[in-house]
Amino acid sequence: MEPQFDFEPAARSLVAIVDAVTEDQLTHPTPCAGSTVRDLLAHVVGLTEAFRQAATKESVGRSTPPPAGNDSPLPDDWRTRIAAQLETLTSAWRVPEAWDGDTEAGGVELPAAVMAIVALDEITVHAWDLAVATGQRPTVAPADLAILHEFLCETDPAGTPGLFGPIVEVPADAPALDRLLGLTGRDPAWRPAAPA
């Protein structure tokens, strides 16, 4: 199967956001309940490698669920590591064979083409999470928004345990990114509370 989309725009956006995170922002809250910027960056370190392995199929039969809670350590080289892993993930999904058959990530087996969309969703939505938590604005390619809207349009309003919270109602005429965020259980108006 030929690649259905390219990860470069989403990867480039996430790298720019990660590059702009400052050390004093690591303890800031994020839209992910109970997760700080540090926690979310540690999650991104893990997911970028997991989805690269899903593309190469090296994870098949040996992937495991991500650690529960927010106990994953953040490596000292998180900034350069995330950038490097996003580059290799992008390259891995450019290989036509990556899109064939089934694959695994995080202990979940899916058709490879569906796994690619899950990876795109994770990269795109967590880029927004990190951006809004650190006072930035993410850039999302219109083509990526269209892919993710189609993927998520049948989301259960009650959410998907372990993945998405209950859908947040967003006006039909809201920007496409806001409508996508609502489907993932996020409030597009979320902002960190002002320091006391």
State where each predicted segment sits.
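Extended, alpha-helix-rich binding/interface surfaces that flank or overlap catalytic cores
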Residues: 40
